[in-house]
Design a protein with these regions (language model features):
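Beta-strand-rich recognition/accessory modules
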Residues: 59-127
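Extracellular glycan-targeting catalytic surfaces
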Residues: 1, 115-117, 140, 147
Length: 147
């Protein structure tokens, strides 16, 4: 940042990393000493921090482990600066994704947010191809072709 945030922006400006929910429904998460399950339906208490109702964060902490029990989906996000917030963004602005958020502190111009994202890597793993068909549809006599 060229200069610290103006006072009216403090607590509002941050960085969001979004996580596609469909891959994580029913999977667990750990954020420091807190644990939970990624819900299929957005629920939870509401807060009104800046004049608009939002769901409260699912948890706040420094180190998030997403899907610790699933080798193909596990990843770790660790903040070297401030706290991480885990949000269910499906209730906020009809976002549709889970959100990991870090808020930019008031007094920083360099290294305002520093995260380390570590995927779990499975050696020699190869993605299985998915065969698709046209979503536009086919004519009555038109042969169906794999694309």
């Amino acid at each position: 940042l060229e200069k610290p945030l103006p006072a009216e922006w403090v607590g509002k400006v941050g960085f969001n990393m979004e996580i596609f929910p469909g891959e994580f429904f029913g999977k667990s998460w750990l954020l420091d000493e807190q644990a939970g399950i990624f819900p299929q339906q957005p629920n939870g208490p509401l807060v009104n921090p800046h004049g608009e109702f939002l769901t409260a964060p699912l948890a706040t902490g420094k180190k998030l482990i997403v899907a610790p029990d699933a080798d193909k989906q596990r990843m770790t996000i660790e903040s070297k600066t401030g706290a991480l917030e885990l949000w269910d963004g499906r209730a906020n602005h009809n976002n549709g994704w889970y959100i990991v958020r870090g808020v930019v502190p008031a007094d920083k111009t360099t290294a305002a947010l520093e995260w380390v994202v570590t995927p779990h890597v499975i050696k020699n793993w190869v993605y299985e191809p998915v065969i698709q068909v046209s979503q536009l549809g086919y004519g009555a006599q038109q042969p169906k072709k794999v694309v």
